[in-house]
């Protein structure tokens, strides 16, 4: 009986490990950490990580979105962030999804006053292409009310993740993992990184999705 119990526990451990591994394969989790106490190293080449590539959802150049749980004035901040990205990248347009359309980028606000001011969950298919993302934002985090400028800044950052970018290793980028509110603009580096992430559509102008396996980061 003792050996049987140990065997059952071992099988349970293997099952949990297997399920956890599957989750890591299916979902790419990005957590935005609010911090102003650390500074990325300036002793390395400036670069932005290229995380993911959109698949067939981007074939027409349009990504649909839906904003949930947002007050009207807060929703305007998110719309402004989406519009800003659209103005700064060629070949991608955002469209609010109607009730009959699938949502490519779901944007929701959490109200738990937790320790995450922004988070993007990217779901990929079996071929490794993005098929939808879920952006989580907050009005309050770390016991503090975030002002409108900060909420819009974080929205821009998370939308960058939704488009396929990882983090930048330098503070002058809106994709920096740390908060530098003075760097609130999209530069050529972010534009080029988005294009490289979705090269099949934005550079090659192809109708067939293809992963850009040769690019894991872009030097700025």
What residue spans do the PLM features occupy?
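Metzincin-family zinc-dependent endopeptidase catalytic domain
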Residues: 75-169
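Divalent metal-coordination and catalytic microenvironments
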Residues: 65, 85, 157-160, 175, ...
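Metalloprotease/metallohydrolase-associated module, dominated by Zn2+-dependent proteases
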Residues: 21-31, 125-150, 166-220
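N-terminal Lys/Arg-rich, disordered targeting/topogenic segments
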Residues: 1-7
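Disordered inhibitory propeptide/activation segment of secreted metzincin zinc metalloprotease zymogens
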Residues: 5, 12-74, 82, 121-126, ...
């Amino acid at each position: 009986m003792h050996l049987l119990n140990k065997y059952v526990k071992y099988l349970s451990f293997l099952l949990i490990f297997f399920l956890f591994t599957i989750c890591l394969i299916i979902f790419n989790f990005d957590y935005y950490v609010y911090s102003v106490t650390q500074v990325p190293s300036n002793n390395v080449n400036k670069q932005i990580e290229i995380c993911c590539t959109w698949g067939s959802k981007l074939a027409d150049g349009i990504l649909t979105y839906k904003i949930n749980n947002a007050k009207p004035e807060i929703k305007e901040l998110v719309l402004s962030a989406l519009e800003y990205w659209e103005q700064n990248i060629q070949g991608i347009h955002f469209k609010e999804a109607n009730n009959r359309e699938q949502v490519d980028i779901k944007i929701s606000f959490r109200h738990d006053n937790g320790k995450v001011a922004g988070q993007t969950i990217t779901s990929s298919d079996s071929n490794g292409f993005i098929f939808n993302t879920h952006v989580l934002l907050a009005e309050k985090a770390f016991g503090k009310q975030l002002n409108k400028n900060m909420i819009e800044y974080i929205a821009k950052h998370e939308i960058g993740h939704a488009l396929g970018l990882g983090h930048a290793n330098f503070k002058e980028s809106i994709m920096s993992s740390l908060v530098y509110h003075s760097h609130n603009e999209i530069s050529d580096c972010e534009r080029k990184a988005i294009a490289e992430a979705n090269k099949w559509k934005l550079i090659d102008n192809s109708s067939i999705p293809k992963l850009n396996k040769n690019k894991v980061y872009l030097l700025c």
